[in-house]
């Protein structure tokens, strides 16, 4: 897409800076790194000539006193109207803050996401992940509430996209993949790279973190096989009741699955060891780095998908043997996940209006009823 190249995010690492933009058509072009102090004033004689690689990323050297950065291309340096500088996000640590985190695939489309997000996050929390990187393409206010709550807890952060396009979809997925890759770099040791409808199932010894700790130091990615779970209905748009919630949970509702296959594999990645991603797996690793395939007995990914010939890869059933089998999560994991999802849903979405009985008498007697945003219990 030949869209405007806007600044998305910028990260300072131990040895350099990475600036991510919103357009891939600048790939390979020359770019100028520009540095600004805490007052957003450009630092004199600090500019640096670089190039866009990979995709929409510009690498720049660090500069003393730089708190904000921007980039310019070609003759843009002489134009007064340029890209406003954005703040540098610190990624300089003695060791990664998180051992295992999740890069959540982009959230877009018309289908409601609030319950899917909760199922996703609570599933991966049970697997031992401690942080989530969200990317918000298009999201309504109701769905956004759960993202805000996870950010409130300090277990998530989100990247917001502001482009000239009314809506973003799968064609911007690669930008999300790389932005999250650079966002997690040096912040997390291992990163699960999965879409919102994908759940890693670990069936190996001990737990997932223990398994990753056993990896040789030169392993930059562990790849997992996948199977598809047939999804036949849209997600609920809003919370109705606890009984309805149990009927809507995807991991209870959908259990017709294909065989496990290496078609459309997914990966857990060491960000600082991988230079370039292709959607959910590494495409280019640094010298000496190896990719390992996890045996099927260790784990696989359950991918919940409906069949829609008009959607991207909507005819996915053609890539499997066509036989669907009933499979479920382990009973102990299911019970824990039900409890976690129920607790989070009720905390965020089980809401009511203010009751007039709750308002202190000194306040209710001072103001007229029509000014009080309340109803009596039995109204």
Which residues make up each language-model segment?
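Active-site-proximal beta-strand/loop segments in catalytic clefts of secreted hydrolases
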Residues: 105-107, 135-137, 161-163, 194-196, ...
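Catalytic-site signature of metal-activated, phosphate-bearing donor transferases
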Residues: 1-87, 92, 170-178, 202-379
